[in-house]
């Protein structure tokens, strides 16, 4: 019985070696050695910013008119950029003109501050320094 266990162990080692060899060959088939390197054109390249206080980097560069127009266009408000609203949130306040002409003489909607004798008396007391505003 002990001999059989030894034989099983040897068969397992051979079998393991065969599995490892197959894995190694499969990896070698899938591997590709890259010797030429290039930048991926589909990926955005991050630029390295210069130091603002260095004198050698602050040389005058020609203005890019297209880039300046793009910056000025982005800084404008949405009403100047677009003829119509782009989102539902922009619909509120897009047209600031009132729908009806407000009549300031109509007392149904306009409640202006009106001074009578009692309100003038209390306002005078408050201006003189009376502390109890609640009474």
Curated annotation (Swiss-Prot):
Keywords from the named record: Cell projection, Cilium, Cytoplasm, Cytoskeleton, Flagellum
Chief site of localization: cytoplasm
CC terms in the record's Gene Ontology section: axonemal B tubule inner sheath; centrosome; ciliary basal body; ciliary base; sperm flagellum
Induction description: Expression is activated by FOXJ1 and NOTO.
Keyword set includes Cytoplasm: yes
GO biological process, one term: flagellated sperm motility
Family annotation (PANTHER family): PROTEIN FAM183B
UniProt-recorded name of the protein: Cilia- and flagella-associated protein 144
Source organism: Mus musculus
């Amino acid at each position: 019985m002990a001999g059989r266990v030894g034989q099983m162990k040897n068969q397992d080692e051979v079998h393991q070696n065969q599995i490892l060899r197959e894995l190694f060959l499969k990896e070698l088939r899938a591997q590709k050695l890259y010797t030429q390197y290039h930048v991926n054109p589909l990926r955005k390249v991050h630029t390295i910013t210069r130091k603002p206080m260095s004198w050698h980097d602050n040389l005058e560069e020609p203005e890019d008119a297209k880039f300046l127009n793009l910056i000025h266009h982005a800084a404008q408000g949405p009403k100047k950029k677009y003829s119509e609203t782009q989102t539902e949130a922009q619909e509120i306040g897009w047209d600031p003109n009132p729908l009806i002409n407000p009549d300031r003489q109509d007392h149904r909607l306009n409640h202006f501050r009106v001074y009578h004798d009692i309100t003038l008396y209390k306002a005078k007391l408050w201006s003189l320094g009376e502390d109890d505003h609640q009474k």
